[in-house]
Amino acid sequence: MLSPKRTKFRKQQRGRMRGVATRGNKIAFGQFALQAQECGWITSRQIEASRRAMTRYVKRGGQIWIRIFPDKPVTMRPAETRMGSGKGNPEFWVAVVKPGRILFEMGGEEITEEIAKEAMRLAQYKLPIKTKFLALAEGEKPTQVGKAPPKSSFLPSDETETAAAQAGTEASSASSVTPLES
């Protein structure tokens, strides 16, 4: 199951889930995705159960990407414990999900839309929130999160490059040493 290797603090406050997801709301790796329709906490066990259901259905074909990670610890007190004496110990980890967040992605040569839809439907049953199946349009490419645009867009064209070089030499010659008047 998924959990962080180490954290700065052992315990966190519960927090509030307001608004919609502004990050992680576009298909970045595969052709098909499962998108959250409402907010909620998804535990590492639920993520693992969904992943198993999808991989079991698609067998060896294609690839599955998990786009959420359980990084929030949830603490619990032992049963029949009196009030006070501090916060409980971390029991499990959850991923905080807002509406619009992509949860899982799927892609590959052998994966058709029907196979992906059925695999995502099986994964939906394991999750505590409403979700929606998404597919990229024919010929559309994923957005590739974390990749820089091609280098050519950073380089200036030949005309601007030579003009900038000339302007730089003119400016440096004009601002060269001027005699001081005493």
Swiss-Prot record:
Keyword Metal-binding: no
Key word RNA-binding present: yes
One Pfam family matching this protein: Ribosomal_L16
Annotated Gene Ontology cellular component terms: ribonucleoprotein complex; ribosome
InterPro entries, A to Z: Ribosomal_uL16, Ribosomal_uL16_bact-type, Ribosomal_uL16_CS, Ribosomal_uL16_dom, Ribosomal_uL16_sf
UniProt keyword terms in alphabetical order: Ribonucleoprotein, Ribosomal protein, RNA-binding, rRNA-binding, tRNA-binding
Biased composition annotated in UniProt, kind: Low complexity: 162-176
Subunit comment: Part of the 50S ribosomal subunit.
GO annotation terms (biological process): translation
Segments of this protein annotated with the region Disordered: 140-182
Function summary: Binds 23S rRNA and is also seen to make contacts with the A and possibly P site tRNAs.
GO molecular function terms attached to this record: rRNA binding; structural constituent of ribosome; tRNA binding
The protein's name in its UniProt record: Large ribosomal subunit protein uL16
Family: Belongs to the universal ribosomal protein uL16 family.
CDD domains documented for this protein: Ribosomal_L16_L10e
SUPFAM superfamilies, per the entry: Ribosomal protein L16p/L10e
Species name: Prochlorococcus marinus (strain SARG / CCMP1375 / SS120)
